[in-house]
Amino acid sequence: MTDIPELVPLIKKNISLNVPPSISKIVAQDLDWTTLQSTPSSLRAKAFSFEVIDLLLAVDCVYHPSLVGRLVDTMRYLATPGKTTVVVVVELRAEDVVREFLEAWLQSDPRWEIWSIGEGRLDSAYALWVGRLKEEMQ
């Protein structure tokens, strides 16, 4: 799990209170999308090393246009083709920002497969998408 540095201690506390250590390996660490985006791609692996992520869950991260590109770049960087499932849950505050996010996500890599989930089952104020990067063909 990642967030801004100030919130990581709270995340760690929530993990320790709610997830038995034997169940799974959940790690909380800070990740600044702005720093990631501004780091040259040739240096990213050294500056931002993560193990392969099974599930990338982005909740309530789409709310301001200035963050859309940063979030999409971060999701693309963290997602391993064929291995990482990305789940994005959005509160539908600003239709234009949500549209901008979806367009940016789809355009960030042609291998993304993205599905809308729960239409008609979620509160109308929320939307949920699941995405995966297809593995490269050999």
Where are the model-predicted features located?
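S-adenosylmethionine-dependent methyltransferases
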Residues: 1-138
